[in-house]
Amino acid sequence: MNEIYLFGDSAAQGIVLDESENYRVSRAGCVRLMKRSGYPIRNYAVHGYTVSQGLECFRNTKTDPGNPCVIEFGGNDCDLDWDAVSQDPDHFHDGKTPLAEFRNLLKQFVQEARDRNLDPILVTPLPLMSGRYYRWVSKGRDAGRILRYLQDDPESISRWLERYAIAVRNTAAECGCHLTDVRAWMLEELDYPSLICEDGIHPNEAGHEIIARKAMEHFPRKG
């Protein structure tokens, strides 16, 4: 293994929310921690990316055969247009990438990685803290109308995301490729809420440390 190619979103990029409520790339992000431990990762993850954007990035990236290709999406794909929700809470709003399309694009990503003789590894999206995330997306919007769309149940946001995590697991099984269930790793932590930023969705630096440690246990470095 000469290199590990990583395509993903803000979680893989190492984004955290600071005390001023600004997003920044942390020097203690999970990938940076792994690179410091000798993991040869080429990180193409970008804050806000969906699987279609990641696939386009992959198509424009030169890769060498025989290396792992880590694919980490779902958090942005499932996200809603919260402006539209707050303006029209009485009609259905789908995710940025509808679930069936998400599955198909994941399978396409896996196939194109294999066509380049890479070893695809799918990663589940992180769980979120529904209450925090509801408060976060309600800022500057009509919180009552958003809550009406959620049928007075902010926890439904987490269940909506879970559908995309299940799709990642099922796609890995159907395609016969490796699965890294980061979602399960985080939920195993009894103090999970303390590992998530105030926006309810991004891991903080303590969370990134957990992800890095478990990833290195899961994929011990060779050589």
Predicted regions and their residues:
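A short acidic, helix-capping loop that chelates divalent metal ions and anchors anionic groups
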Residues: 13-17, 52, 79-80, 131-132
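A short local structural element in Rossmann-fold oxidoreductases
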Residues: 16, 55, 191
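Serine-esterase "nucleophile elbow" of acetyl-processing enzymes
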Residues: 1-45, 59-65, 204
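Cell-envelope and extracellular/periplasmic
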Residues: 11, 45-49, 73-74, 83
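Alpha-helical cap/lid subdomain in secreted, periplasmic
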Residues: 36, 59-223
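Structural motif
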Residues: 48-58
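Short, flexible loop segments at the rims of nucleotide/cofactor-binding pockets, characterized by
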Residues: 20-22, 45-49, 98-99, 156-157
